[in-house]
A protein has these predicted regions:
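Non-heme di-metal
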Residues: 1-128
Length: 128
């Protein structure tokens, strides 16, 4: 059955999931730095949720399901944060990479762009 709106369609496609603690897997030689740098960027998950929340305060399409989908995305960002923190704890992350990621996060927070643009760019470039 076809969903009433594209927003409802996207929301219906989402799967329920719960973050769980993990143990460190074995990484290929040379992959440790890549994984640690990626895990350090977990500090951007909550800001992405905040960008979405900020966007919900402004003009949104008056289409059924839009706000509900965005609200569910904020919850997803919180779950991503928990899951990535579990992975970071399991693998460990260099303080140097944490510092680099904090600088990147600060730069994004200070960027004077629409919150949806910031959320979309981060989701597409960092988390996918």
């Amino acid at each position: 059955m076809k969903a009433e709106t594209p927003y409802i369609h996207l929301h219906q496609r989402k799967r329920t999931w719960t973050p769980v603690q993990v143990s460190a897997g074995q990484l290929l030689d040379g992959g440790e730095e890549v994984i640690q740098r990626a895990l350090a960027l977990r500090c951007l998950e909550i800001p992405v949720g905040d960008f979405i929340t900020d966007a919900m305060k402004g003009d949104l399409p008056d289409v059924k399901g839009c706000k509900e989908l965005l609200a569910s995305n904020v919850v997803d960002e919180e779950k991503h944060d928990i899951a990535l923190n579990f992975a970071a704890t399991a693998h460990g992350v260099s303080p140097r990479f944490e510092k680099e990621a904090a600088h990147i996060c600060k730069t994004w927070l200070e960027l004077d762009r629409h919150p949806v643009l910031k959320a979309v760019v981060l989701e597409r470039s960092v988390f996918f």
